[in-house]
Design a protein with these regions (language model features):
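Glycine/proline-enriched, intrinsically flexible loops and inter-domain linkers
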Residues: 5, 23, 53-55, 189, ...
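Beta-rich nucleic-acid/ligand-interaction surfaces
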Residues: 39-43, 200-203, 455, 491-492, ...
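Mobile "lid/hinge" segments at catalytic clefts and subdomain interfaces of large enzymes
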Residues: 114-130, 135-140, 154, 162, ...
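A carboxyl-terminal module marker
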Residues: 2, 20, 27, 439-442, ...
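Terminal amphipathic helices with adjacent charged low-complexity linkers/tails
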Residues: 185, 189-214, 391-420
Length: 803
């Protein structure tokens, strides 16, 4: 969030320097990422008055004698410009000066004539017409006539200013504006806040009727609109142009600038519809119809679906709600009547639409963090005041204010001074706390029993309980009042890893030995992750516990699966150019018995495995699982099972001792197609995921593994090449082979072949069988008998033939 120092000074009587204010903001919890001086890179550039000038013979140059006050009254400087005259004041970069971009000015000869500096254009000082009029003229920047020679150029052209680039945390959407930061500055300095003027008068009745309705109040809690006729397009005043320019925006026209100015100043996004382009004089806020299209103001076309909220006229969408207006309803030089819109839209709706369409804007950035329901009222009033002040149009009596029926109420928190001080660990005088809260626009009603009834401002939706009040108090009172103390610690004991910790460490080492790296993700994500994996609405995984005070909507529920987090890690790696990798994560998932929860959820330890890359396949993850099985002296079996997020033909469920441990396989094609990665990556990437109930896995492990002496008798190996239908699962074959005889101690698939010689719909799978008996040598007759039984069972149960 970029906030000009000069704009803050218009709203608060600031009596400290920009550097001092930066420190104060930081001490109150606002990180100033950068304090940008507008005159950065400029030194020894002063006002110079041209007292003599004559053409430099044989060149296009003009020799000037310049009065630079204390720096010299007759400094000779040559210039190639031709727009100046005697007596003009211009910027003079003297010998040894610097300009933006690291340009250094030295005295030198120009076409044989000594020049002791350079006369500057506005562009050479980093200016444009919005910052200082005349800056974009071809030639020198002509300064006001009353400029004093020798004066530093910065205050003359408005470069004696700073831009605060402030990082706004997710819980403070009210600070996404100049006014929001000004409120904090006023509280910090103990100064009054000068609210922007918001009064206006209606001057005429509407000359036509307009229909405005909201069909999705759950996604649009408040929608306000006001009709303004006889629009008069013109240039914006200099002060407004400068405000916009300091925040990185160019002036377009007075009406467009008012909407942008309101966004920056009040933090309220707004839009203006050209009523001559609104079919049926009708505005409706609704969900989009599947397949509807809209072309936005930046000339991008989007195909919509019911997950997108739109503003429509009687025929078509005219705006993406909370993101950007449509090109089919925008104002132009012929606009004569406008409907100004201010609204609040659901954060989730704007965020999902913005992400799905890849369309971001200053408006969507604010709506995604949250705009309170009182904000449209203030934003619209401010915009209408500016319409009146700049004489942009005639404000009619026709206005709309549609809500979801909920009243605007301040949050009330009943607490005591002792509770607040208990959170802080220090004693703060009661009156000091009351004064701080009042400076922050809270009201404090002291009750007869000594408790406080504190009401928060309407824009402070982040304040929920007395610990929030404690935070407000201490950040204004000063964190330096908290006395550092040593932590109370228990006596140090010589501990060690318990059985569960040892097993977890062993699991991680087994996976690391197979080339897998451990990932670590947050325990939260959003319900959108379930949509990403196409998890059905009735699935138990969707019973996620919602966080009461989430950092953001992206981290609003406790995870019930690790797979969404693992997939996001893989996508992030692909976006950053990591084309291949193997990852695992061992962490708890949080399963509620019912919602809303009335008891502690079950934290179930889970293992997730991910592999991605052109060379990875189904057997990468299966091999990792087999490595775990071998490490814990277990035998896994596999069965075909359909899961929403895995490919139906390249996935399986894992079992051990009859217990289902989890699933693994290739990411479903339709999910892969929706990933926010380049198309060539989607076409070339193989993404495989597996998720296991780690507690169920460990329940199959029979205590500590014991040393087993090697059998004195040699094991016998036999390879079988089998031909079967494509539909036959490898796991079914393995299970059938193992059940044929207790002599079979190991079964490994080592080859799969498909070819025309096998016939359509057929495949060949080659298995290596190990036969052994710890008590005796396995005879040839036993081997032949076992192999014969294996083949017979395979043919009878699965229709498999020997190749």
């Amino acid at each position: 969030m970029k906030v000009p120092f000069s704009w803050l000074k218009e709203l608060v009587d600031i009596d400290v320097t920009a550097q001092e204010l930066e420190e104060k903001l930081f001490s109150c919890g606002f990180e100033v990422e950068e304090l940008i001086p507008l005159d950065a890179g400029i030194s020894k550039v002063v006002v110079g008055r041209i007292v003599e000038m004559e053409p430099q013979e044989g060149t296009h140059l003009t020799k000037c004698v310049v009065d630079c006050g204390e720096y010299g009254h007759d400094i000779r400087i040559s210039t190639g410009a031709a727009n100046m005259k005697l007596g003009d004041c211009v910027p003079a970069a003297l010998d040894g000066s610097t300009l933006p971009g690291g340009i250094k000015i030295k005295a030198r000869k120009m076409q044989g004539v000594e020049s002791n500096g350079m006369l500057c254009s506005g562009e050479e000082l980093g200016l444009n017409d919005d910052l200082f009029p005349g800056s974009e003229v071809y030639g020198l920047l002509i300064l006001p006539e009353d400029s004093v020679p020798g004066t530093d150029i910065a205050p003359v052209v408005g470069l004696d200013d700073y831009i605060f680039d402030i990082s706004i945390t997710a819980n403070r959407p009210d600070c996404q504006s100049v006014l929001g930061i000004a409120r904090e500055v006023a509280a910090i300095l103990g100064k009054p806040l000068h609210m922007p003027a918001m009064d206006y008068n209606t001057v005429c009745d509407a000359d036509e009727t307009i229909s405005v309705k909201v069909e999705a109040p759950d996604l649009c809690p408040r929608y306000m609109a006001h009709y303004v006729r006889n629009i008069r397009m013109s240039e914006s005043p200099r002060w407004m142009k400068r405000h916009l320019a300091l925040c990185g925006l160019r002036s377009i026209s007075n009406v467009v600038d008012i909407t942008n100015h309101t966004l920056l100043e009040m933090g309220q996004p707004m839009h203006a519809f050209d009523l001559s382009k609104v079919a049926g004089r009708s505005i409706t806020v609704r969900r989009a119809v599947e397949g509807e299209k809209i072309t936005t103001l930046d000339e991008k076309e989007f195909t919509l679906n019911p997950n997108n909220l739109v503003i429509c006229d009687a025929e078509k969408p005219v705006a993406l709600a909370g993101i950007m207006g449509g090109a089919n309803s925008g104002m132009d030089d012929n606009t004569t009547s406008l409907l100004f819109e201010c609204a609040t839209f659901a954060r989730d709706s704007v965020r999902k639409t913005s992400r799905a369409l890849g369309q971001n804007s200053d408006s969507s950035a604010r709506y995604e963090k949250g705009v309170d329901r009182h904000s449209p009222e203030l934003g619209l009033a401010r915009a209408l005041h500016l319409i009146q002040e700049l004489d942009c149009g005639d404000i009619t009596t026709l206005e709309y204010d549609l809500t979801d029926g909920r009243p605007l109420e301040r949050k009330h928190i009943v607490t005591t001074p002792a509770k607040i001080c208990g959170v802080l660990g220090i004693t703060v005088p009661d009156q000091t706390m009351i004064d701080i809260l009042k400076r922050l626009e809270f009201t404090v009603d002291v009750q007869a029993d000594g408790s406080w009834d504190v009401s928060a401002p309407l824009y402070r939706e982040d304040v929920e309980s007395f610990p929030d009040l404690a935070e407000e108090v201490i950040r204004e009172y000063g964190y330096d009042h908290i006395v550092p103390t040593f932590l109370n610690t228990a006596a140090v004991t010589n501990g060690g890893l318990n059985y569960e910790q040892k097993q977890q460490l062993k699991t991680k080492r087994l996976l690391a030995a197979q080339g897998f790296y451990e990932a670590s993700t947050l325990a939260f994500y959003s319900n959108a992750e379930f949509d990403m994996l196409h998890i059905p609405a009735e699935d138990e995984a969707r019973k996620a516990i919602r966080i009461l005070n989430p950092i953001s909507e992206n981290l609003s529920v406790m995870r019930t699966l690790l797979a969404p987090s693992m997939l996001n890690v893989i996508v992030d790696n692909l976006k950053k150019g990591n084309a291949e990798g193997r990852l695992f994560e061992m962490a708890p998932v949080y399963l509620a018995k019912e919602l809303p929860i009335n008891e502690h959820p079950h934290e179930r330890q889970t293992l997730c495995i991910g592999a991605f890359g052109p060379e990875e396949d189904f057997f990468t993850v299966k091999g990792a699982l087999e490595g775990l099985a071998e490490g814990f002296d277990l035998t896994f079996t596999y069965q075909r099972e359909t899961t929403s997020w895995l490919h139906p033909g390249i996935s399986a469920a894992v079992y051990c001792n009859g217990k289902r441990l989890g699933v693994f396989g290739k990411l479903a094609n339709e999910i892969n197609a929706e990933l926010e990665i380049a198309k060539e990556q989607k076409d070339s990437q193989n993404i495989y995921l597996g998720e296991l109930d780690y507690e169920a896995l460990m329940s199959c492990v029979e205590g500590e593994l014991r040393y087993k002496p090697l059998s004195p008798y040699a094991a016998v190996k036999r390879d079988l090449a089998l031909v079967c239908d494509e539909s036959v699962a490898c796991g079914d074959i393995e299970e059938t082979i193992r059940k044929a005889s207790p002599l079979i101690t190991e079964v490994k698939l080592f080859d799969i072949y498909r070819g025309a010689n096998l016939g359509e719909g057929k495949k060949s799978m080659a298995f290596s069988l190990t036969l052994s008996d710890p008590a005796a040598e396995v005879s040839n007759e036993q081997v032949e008998r076992t192999v014969k039984k294996v083949l017979g069972n395979l043919k009878f149960k699965l229709g498999i033939e020997i190749r």
